[in-house]
Amino acid sequence: MRQGHRMTLSPLRPIPRQLHNAPESAEDFSKRLAELTAALAETAEQYDISAQFPHANFQLLHAHGLLGLTVPTELGGGGADLPRAQQVISAVARGEPSTALILVMQYLQHSRLQENRNWPSHLRVQVAEQAVREGALINALRVEPDLGTPARGGLPGTIARRTAQGWRISGSKIYSTGSHGLTWFAVWARSDDDDPLVGSWLVHKDTPGITIIEDWDHLGMRATSSHEVRFDNVLVPLDHAVSVSPWSAPQSELDGSGLLWMSVLLSSVYDGIAQSARDWLVHWLEQRTPSNLGASLSTLPRFQETVGQIDTLLFANCSLLQSAAHGHTPAQHAGQIKYLVTGNAIRAVELAIEASGNPGLSRSNPLQRHYRNVLCGRVHTPQNDAVLTGVGRAAFAARSKDH
Protein backbone atom coordinates (compact mmCIF):
# COMPACT_ATOMS: atom_id res chain seq x y z
CA MET A 1 0.00 0.00 0.00
CA ARG A 2 1.53 3.25 -1.13
CA GLN A 3 1.15 6.42 0.90
CA GLY A 4 1.68 10.10 0.32
CA HIS A 5 3.51 12.47 2.65
CA ARG A 6 3.08 11.44 6.27
CA MET A 7 4.17 13.24 9.42
CA THR A 8 5.48 11.30 12.38
CA LEU A 9 4.15 11.60 15.91
CA SER A 10 5.94 9.59 18.55
CA PRO A 11 3.92 7.86 21.26
CA LEU A 12 3.31 10.47 23.91
CA ARG A 13 2.88 8.13 26.84
CA PRO A 14 3.74 4.54 27.70
CA ILE A 15 1.12 1.94 26.93
CA PRO A 16 -0.10 0.43 30.20
CA ARG A 17 -0.28 -3.25 30.92
CA GLN A 18 -3.31 -5.25 29.89
CA LEU A 19 -6.07 -4.66 32.42
CA HIS A 20 -9.04 -6.60 31.12
CA ASN A 21 -8.70 -9.80 33.16
CA ALA A 22 -12.14 -11.23 33.96
CA PRO A 23 -14.15 -11.11 36.09
CA GLU A 24 -14.58 -7.39 36.45
CA SER A 25 -17.33 -5.61 38.34
CA ALA A 26 -19.37 -2.84 36.75
CA GLU A 27 -17.78 -0.39 39.17
CA ASP A 28 -14.26 -1.48 38.26
CA PHE A 29 -15.06 -1.32 34.56
CA SER A 30 -16.41 2.21 34.91
CA LYS A 31 -13.32 3.23 36.85
CA ARG A 32 -11.08 1.74 34.19
CA LEU A 33 -12.95 3.63 31.48
CA ALA A 34 -12.55 6.90 33.41
CA GLU A 35 -8.80 6.32 33.54
CA LEU A 36 -8.83 5.56 29.83
CA THR A 37 -10.66 8.82 29.13
CA ALA A 38 -8.00 10.76 31.00
CA ALA A 39 -5.17 8.97 29.19
CA LEU A 40 -6.67 9.67 25.77
CA ALA A 41 -7.31 13.32 26.63
CA GLU A 42 -3.61 13.86 27.32
CA THR A 43 -2.71 13.71 23.63
CA ALA A 44 -5.99 14.80 22.03
CA GLU A 45 -4.67 18.28 21.25
CA GLN A 46 -1.54 16.89 19.60
CA TYR A 47 -3.54 14.58 17.35
CA ASP A 48 -5.80 17.48 16.45
CA ILE A 49 -2.75 19.48 15.36
CA SER A 50 -0.97 16.68 13.50
CA ALA A 51 -4.10 15.04 12.04
CA GLN A 52 -2.26 11.72 12.18
CA PHE A 53 -3.90 8.37 12.78
CA PRO A 54 -3.81 7.79 16.57
CA HIS A 55 -1.82 4.55 16.56
CA ALA A 56 -0.84 4.87 20.23
CA ASN A 57 -4.50 5.22 21.21
CA PHE A 58 -5.39 1.98 19.47
CA GLN A 59 -2.46 0.21 21.07
CA LEU A 60 -3.92 1.38 24.37
CA LEU A 61 -7.41 0.18 23.48
CA HIS A 62 -6.01 -3.17 22.39
CA ALA A 63 -4.12 -3.47 25.68
CA HIS A 64 -7.46 -2.97 27.42
CA GLY A 65 -9.12 -5.68 25.32
CA LEU A 66 -11.53 -3.20 23.73
CA LEU A 67 -10.91 -3.66 19.99
CA GLY A 68 -12.62 -7.05 20.05
CA LEU A 69 -15.35 -5.98 22.46
CA THR A 70 -18.25 -6.81 20.10
CA VAL A 71 -16.66 -9.99 18.75
CA PRO A 72 -18.55 -13.04 20.09
CA THR A 73 -17.07 -14.68 23.18
CA GLU A 74 -16.68 -18.01 21.40
CA LEU A 75 -14.15 -16.32 19.12
CA GLY A 76 -12.30 -14.76 22.04
CA GLY A 77 -14.05 -11.39 22.02
CA GLY A 78 -16.04 -9.54 24.63
CA GLY A 79 -19.47 -10.45 23.27
CA ALA A 80 -20.66 -6.99 24.30
CA ASP A 81 -24.24 -5.86 23.92
CA LEU A 82 -25.22 -2.35 22.85
CA PRO A 83 -25.27 -0.79 26.36
CA ARG A 84 -21.73 -2.02 27.02
CA ALA A 85 -20.47 -0.81 23.63
CA GLN A 86 -22.15 2.56 24.16
CA GLN A 87 -20.47 2.95 27.54
CA VAL A 88 -17.05 2.41 25.98
CA ILE A 89 -17.64 4.73 23.02
CA SER A 90 -18.81 7.50 25.35
CA ALA A 91 -15.69 7.17 27.50
CA VAL A 92 -13.34 7.13 24.51
CA ALA A 93 -15.12 10.10 22.90
CA ARG A 94 -14.73 12.19 26.02
CA GLY A 95 -10.99 11.65 25.72
CA GLU A 96 -10.33 11.73 21.96
CA PRO A 97 -13.35 11.60 19.63
CA SER A 98 -11.56 10.71 16.39
CA THR A 99 -10.42 7.52 18.08
CA ALA A 100 -14.00 6.92 19.19
CA LEU A 101 -15.40 7.33 15.68
CA ILE A 102 -12.97 4.78 14.25
CA LEU A 103 -13.87 2.46 17.14
CA VAL A 104 -17.57 2.88 16.34
CA MET A 105 -16.92 1.54 12.85
CA GLN A 106 -15.07 -1.44 14.34
CA TYR A 107 -17.94 -2.21 16.70
CA LEU A 108 -20.59 -1.88 14.01
CA GLN A 109 -18.78 -4.27 11.68
CA HIS A 110 -18.22 -6.93 14.33
CA SER A 111 -21.60 -6.61 16.04
CA ARG A 112 -23.28 -8.20 13.02
CA LEU A 113 -20.45 -9.95 11.18
CA GLN A 114 -20.99 -13.47 12.51
CA GLU A 115 -24.69 -13.31 11.66
CA ASN A 116 -23.99 -12.36 8.04
CA ARG A 117 -24.12 -15.72 6.28
CA ASN A 118 -23.21 -14.11 2.97
CA TRP A 119 -19.62 -14.05 4.25
CA PRO A 120 -17.66 -17.30 3.94
CA SER A 121 -17.26 -18.70 7.44
CA HIS A 122 -13.47 -18.80 7.28
CA LEU A 123 -13.32 -15.06 6.50
CA ARG A 124 -15.74 -14.22 9.31
CA VAL A 125 -13.56 -16.12 11.75
CA GLN A 126 -10.29 -14.72 10.37
CA VAL A 127 -11.38 -11.09 10.62
CA ALA A 128 -12.83 -11.59 14.10
CA GLU A 129 -9.84 -13.46 15.51
CA GLN A 130 -7.42 -10.88 14.11
CA ALA A 131 -9.40 -8.15 15.86
CA VAL A 132 -9.06 -9.96 19.17
CA ARG A 133 -5.45 -11.13 18.90
CA GLU A 134 -3.85 -8.36 16.85
CA GLY A 135 -6.21 -5.41 17.24
CA ALA A 136 -6.93 -5.47 13.50
CA LEU A 137 -9.43 -2.80 12.42
CA ILE A 138 -12.06 -2.98 9.71
CA ASN A 139 -14.32 -0.36 8.14
CA ALA A 140 -16.63 -0.01 5.17
CA LEU A 141 -15.40 2.29 2.39
CA ARG A 142 -18.46 3.60 0.58
CA VAL A 143 -18.33 7.30 -0.36
CA GLU A 144 -17.03 8.17 -3.84
CA PRO A 145 -15.77 11.37 -5.52
CA ASP A 146 -18.50 11.44 -8.17
CA LEU A 147 -21.45 9.72 -6.49
CA GLY A 148 -21.02 11.04 -2.97
CA THR A 149 -22.70 9.07 -0.20
CA PRO A 150 -24.63 5.93 -1.24
CA ALA A 151 -27.31 6.86 1.29
CA ARG A 152 -28.73 9.14 -1.42
CA GLY A 153 -28.94 6.29 -3.93
CA GLY A 154 -27.06 5.29 -7.06
CA LEU A 155 -24.57 2.71 -8.26
CA PRO A 156 -20.93 2.80 -7.15
CA GLY A 157 -18.32 3.79 -9.68
CA THR A 158 -15.88 1.29 -8.18
CA ILE A 159 -15.84 -1.79 -10.41
CA ALA A 160 -15.01 -5.40 -9.52
CA ARG A 161 -14.18 -7.44 -12.62
CA ARG A 162 -14.34 -11.22 -12.42
CA THR A 163 -11.22 -12.95 -13.77
CA ALA A 164 -9.77 -16.46 -13.62
CA GLN A 165 -7.48 -15.34 -10.80
CA GLY A 166 -10.16 -13.56 -8.77
CA TRP A 167 -11.80 -10.13 -8.64
CA ARG A 168 -9.94 -7.11 -10.00
CA ILE A 169 -11.13 -3.96 -8.20
CA SER A 170 -10.61 -0.42 -9.48
CA GLY A 171 -12.00 2.84 -8.13
CA SER A 172 -11.67 5.52 -5.45
CA LYS A 173 -13.21 5.97 -2.03
CA ILE A 174 -13.20 9.27 -0.16
CA TYR A 175 -13.78 10.06 3.52
CA SER A 176 -12.39 6.61 4.37
CA THR A 177 -12.45 6.80 8.15
CA GLY A 178 -9.44 5.14 9.73
CA SER A 179 -7.61 4.59 6.43
CA HIS A 180 -4.02 4.35 7.69
CA GLY A 181 -4.95 2.18 10.65
CA LEU A 182 -7.25 -0.31 8.95
CA THR A 183 -6.26 -3.90 8.27
CA TRP A 184 -9.41 -4.66 6.28
CA PHE A 185 -11.36 -2.54 3.80
CA ALA A 186 -14.97 -3.53 3.08
CA VAL A 187 -15.15 -1.86 -0.34
CA TRP A 188 -18.57 -0.98 -1.72
CA ALA A 189 -18.45 -1.76 -5.44
CA ARG A 190 -20.32 -3.34 -8.35
CA SER A 191 -19.42 -6.13 -10.68
CA ASP A 192 -19.18 -5.69 -14.45
CA ASP A 193 -22.15 -7.99 -15.13
CA ASP A 194 -25.19 -6.86 -17.12
CA ASP A 195 -27.16 -7.07 -13.87
CA PRO A 196 -24.31 -6.10 -11.57
CA LEU A 197 -23.68 -7.51 -8.16
CA VAL A 198 -23.56 -4.63 -5.68
CA GLY A 199 -22.16 -4.74 -2.18
CA SER A 200 -18.93 -5.24 -0.26
CA TRP A 201 -15.67 -6.83 -1.35
CA LEU A 202 -13.17 -7.61 1.41
CA VAL A 203 -9.68 -6.24 0.72
CA HIS A 204 -6.60 -6.57 2.93
CA LYS A 205 -4.55 -3.41 3.39
CA ASP A 206 -1.36 -4.99 2.01
CA THR A 207 -2.88 -6.04 -1.31
CA PRO A 208 -0.86 -4.54 -4.20
CA GLY A 209 -2.51 -1.64 -6.02
CA ILE A 210 -3.84 0.29 -3.01
CA THR A 211 -2.82 3.93 -2.55
CA ILE A 212 -3.84 6.28 0.25
CA ILE A 213 -4.05 9.91 -0.86
CA GLU A 214 -3.61 12.06 2.24
CA ASP A 215 -6.26 14.67 1.50
CA TRP A 216 -8.08 14.78 4.86
CA ASP A 217 -7.48 18.31 6.21
CA HIS A 218 -10.70 18.90 8.05
CA LEU A 219 -11.94 21.49 10.51
CA GLY A 220 -12.89 18.84 13.06
CA MET A 221 -12.34 15.14 13.83
CA ARG A 222 -8.94 15.64 12.30
CA ALA A 223 -7.32 12.42 13.54
CA THR A 224 -9.83 10.11 11.85
CA SER A 225 -7.43 9.74 8.90
CA SER A 226 -10.43 9.90 6.55
CA HIS A 227 -8.31 10.04 3.42
CA GLU A 228 -9.04 8.98 -0.13
CA VAL A 229 -8.20 5.35 -0.87
CA ARG A 230 -7.58 4.35 -4.49
CA PHE A 231 -7.75 0.83 -5.86
CA ASP A 232 -5.89 0.14 -9.09
CA ASN A 233 -6.65 -3.31 -10.48
CA VAL A 234 -6.47 -4.77 -6.96
CA LEU A 235 -6.73 -8.58 -6.98
CA VAL A 236 -8.76 -10.40 -4.31
CA PRO A 237 -9.99 -14.02 -4.21
CA LEU A 238 -13.41 -14.80 -5.63
CA ASP A 239 -14.83 -15.57 -2.18
CA HIS A 240 -13.98 -12.02 -1.04
CA ALA A 241 -17.22 -10.79 -2.59
CA VAL A 242 -18.50 -11.13 0.94
CA SER A 243 -21.83 -9.34 0.92
CA VAL A 244 -23.22 -8.73 -2.55
CA SER A 245 -26.59 -9.03 -4.24
CA PRO A 246 -27.93 -8.34 -7.75
CA TRP A 247 -28.81 -4.71 -8.45
CA SER A 248 -32.22 -5.95 -9.63
CA ALA A 249 -32.87 -7.60 -6.25
CA PRO A 250 -31.04 -5.53 -3.62
CA GLN A 251 -30.72 -6.64 -0.02
CA SER A 252 -30.73 -4.24 2.89
CA GLU A 253 -27.38 -4.17 4.69
CA LEU A 254 -28.83 -3.02 8.03
CA ASP A 255 -31.85 -4.41 9.85
CA GLY A 256 -33.61 -2.56 12.65
CA SER A 257 -31.09 -3.69 15.24
CA GLY A 258 -28.20 -2.54 13.05
CA LEU A 259 -29.78 0.87 12.58
CA LEU A 260 -30.12 1.32 16.34
CA TRP A 261 -26.53 0.26 16.93
CA MET A 262 -25.34 2.78 14.36
CA SER A 263 -27.51 5.59 15.70
CA VAL A 264 -26.64 5.02 19.36
CA LEU A 265 -22.89 4.59 18.91
CA LEU A 266 -22.45 7.38 16.39
CA SER A 267 -24.51 9.78 18.49
CA SER A 268 -22.55 8.83 21.59
CA VAL A 269 -19.37 10.17 20.00
CA TYR A 270 -20.82 13.66 19.73
CA ASP A 271 -22.54 13.48 23.10
CA GLY A 272 -19.14 12.58 24.58
CA ILE A 273 -17.59 15.66 22.98
CA ALA A 274 -20.31 17.83 24.53
CA GLN A 275 -19.71 16.25 27.94
CA SER A 276 -16.04 17.20 27.73
CA ALA A 277 -16.97 20.75 26.73
CA ARG A 278 -19.34 20.96 29.68
CA ASP A 279 -16.67 19.75 32.09
CA TRP A 280 -14.18 22.32 30.80
CA LEU A 281 -16.72 25.14 31.20
CA VAL A 282 -17.64 24.16 34.76
CA HIS A 283 -13.98 24.03 35.75
CA TRP A 284 -13.26 27.37 34.06
CA LEU A 285 -16.23 29.08 35.73
CA GLU A 286 -15.05 27.82 39.12
CA GLN A 287 -11.51 29.06 38.53
CA ARG A 288 -12.28 32.39 36.88
CA THR A 289 -12.48 35.12 39.54
CA PRO A 290 -12.71 38.67 38.13
CA SER A 291 -11.12 41.28 40.37
CA ASN A 292 -14.28 43.39 40.48
CA LEU A 293 -16.41 40.43 41.55
CA GLY A 294 -14.33 38.97 44.33
CA ALA A 295 -15.80 35.53 43.70
CA SER A 296 -15.76 32.96 40.93
CA LEU A 297 -18.08 33.24 37.95
CA SER A 298 -19.74 30.04 39.12
CA THR A 299 -21.47 32.05 41.86
CA LEU A 300 -23.44 34.14 39.35
CA PRO A 301 -27.00 33.06 38.47
CA ARG A 302 -26.40 33.79 34.79
CA PHE A 303 -23.69 31.14 34.54
CA GLN A 304 -25.53 28.73 36.79
CA GLU A 305 -28.46 28.95 34.39
CA THR A 306 -26.20 28.28 31.41
CA VAL A 307 -24.73 25.19 33.03
CA GLY A 308 -28.27 24.13 33.89
CA GLN A 309 -29.25 24.44 30.23
CA ILE A 310 -26.25 22.39 29.16
CA ASP A 311 -26.85 19.70 31.76
CA THR A 312 -30.50 19.47 30.75
CA LEU A 313 -29.57 18.98 27.10
CA LEU A 314 -27.11 16.27 28.10
CA PHE A 315 -29.70 14.69 30.40
CA ALA A 316 -32.04 14.44 27.42
CA ASN A 317 -29.25 12.82 25.43
CA CYS A 318 -28.54 10.33 28.19
CA SER A 319 -32.21 9.41 28.39
CA LEU A 320 -32.50 8.93 24.63
CA LEU A 321 -29.31 6.90 24.33
CA GLN A 322 -30.01 4.69 27.34
CA SER A 323 -33.56 3.99 26.21
CA ALA A 324 -32.44 3.00 22.73
CA ALA A 325 -29.44 0.99 23.93
CA HIS A 326 -31.61 -1.07 26.27
CA GLY A 327 -34.17 -1.84 23.58
CA HIS A 328 -36.93 0.53 24.67
CA THR A 329 -36.98 2.60 21.47
CA PRO A 330 -38.32 1.16 18.19
CA ALA A 331 -35.81 1.00 15.34
CA GLN A 332 -37.99 3.31 13.24
CA HIS A 333 -36.81 6.17 15.49
CA ALA A 334 -33.09 5.53 14.96
CA GLY A 335 -32.66 8.56 12.72
CA GLN A 336 -34.51 10.80 15.15
CA ILE A 337 -32.17 9.73 17.95
CA LYS A 338 -29.18 10.80 15.89
CA TYR A 339 -30.86 14.09 14.96
CA LEU A 340 -31.78 14.95 18.55
CA VAL A 341 -28.59 13.82 20.28
CA THR A 342 -26.21 15.51 17.84
CA GLY A 343 -28.35 18.65 17.82
CA ASN A 344 -28.37 18.80 21.61
CA ALA A 345 -24.62 18.20 21.70
CA ILE A 346 -23.93 21.04 19.28
CA ARG A 347 -26.19 23.40 21.21
CA ALA A 348 -24.51 22.46 24.49
CA VAL A 349 -21.07 23.36 23.13
CA GLU A 350 -22.43 26.58 21.63
CA LEU A 351 -23.76 27.57 25.05
CA ALA A 352 -20.36 26.88 26.58
CA ILE A 353 -18.73 29.16 24.01
CA GLU A 354 -21.29 31.91 24.58
CA ALA A 355 -20.64 31.74 28.32
CA SER A 356 -16.85 31.71 28.13
CA GLY A 357 -16.39 34.30 25.39
CA ASN A 358 -12.89 34.82 24.01
CA PRO A 359 -11.21 32.24 26.28
CA GLY A 360 -13.48 29.55 24.87
CA LEU A 361 -12.32 30.28 21.33
CA SER A 362 -8.66 30.53 22.25
CA ARG A 363 -6.44 27.78 20.86
CA SER A 364 -4.86 27.50 24.29
CA ASN A 365 -8.12 25.99 25.57
CA PRO A 366 -9.83 22.80 24.35
CA LEU A 367 -13.32 24.26 23.98
CA GLN A 368 -12.68 25.47 20.43
CA ARG A 369 -11.51 21.95 19.53
CA HIS A 370 -14.66 20.46 21.03
CA TYR A 371 -16.72 22.88 18.97
CA ARG A 372 -14.96 22.00 15.72
CA ASN A 373 -15.36 18.31 16.48
CA VAL A 374 -19.00 18.40 17.52
CA LEU A 375 -20.07 20.21 14.34
CA CYS A 376 -19.09 17.12 12.36
CA GLY A 377 -22.11 15.33 13.81
CA ARG A 378 -24.28 17.06 11.23
CA VAL A 379 -22.37 15.47 8.36
CA HIS A 380 -22.88 11.80 9.20
CA THR A 381 -25.58 9.71 7.59
CA PRO A 382 -28.46 10.05 8.14
CA GLN A 383 -28.31 13.80 7.65
CA ASN A 384 -30.95 16.07 9.15
CA ASP A 385 -32.98 16.68 6.00
CA ALA A 386 -33.22 12.96 5.28
CA VAL A 387 -34.29 12.20 8.85
CA LEU A 388 -37.00 14.86 9.01
CA THR A 389 -38.30 14.19 5.51
CA GLY A 390 -38.60 10.50 6.35
CA VAL A 391 -40.48 11.22 9.56
CA GLY A 392 -42.84 13.60 7.80
CA ARG A 393 -43.45 11.17 4.96
CA ALA A 394 -44.27 8.44 7.47
CA ALA A 395 -46.77 10.72 9.20
CA PHE A 396 -48.69 11.32 5.98
CA ALA A 397 -48.47 7.65 5.02
CA ALA A 398 -50.00 6.69 8.36
CA ARG A 399 -52.91 9.07 7.80
CA SER A 400 -53.57 7.70 4.33
CA LYS A 401 -53.81 4.18 5.78
CA ASP A 402 -56.33 5.36 8.37
CA HIS A 403 -58.50 6.74 5.62
Give the role of each language-model region.
Residues 1-6:
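Short, Lys/Arg-enriched N-terminal segments with co-localized hydrophobic residues
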Residues 36, 267, 274-277, 281, ...:
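Amphipathic alpha-helices that form helix-helix packing interfaces
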Residues 36-45:
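N-terminal capping segment at the start of a domain
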Residues 45-48, 315-340, 353-361:
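C-terminal helix-coil-helix/basic helical segment that borders enzyme active sites and/or dimer interfaces
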Residues 55-63, 69-172, 177:
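Glycine-rich flavin
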Residues 172-212:
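A short core secondary-structure module
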Residues 218-313:
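Glycine-rich beta->alpha junctions and the first turn(s) of the following alpha-helix
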Residues 358-403:
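Glycine-rich phosphate/cofactor-binding loops in nucleotide/flavin-utilizing enzymes
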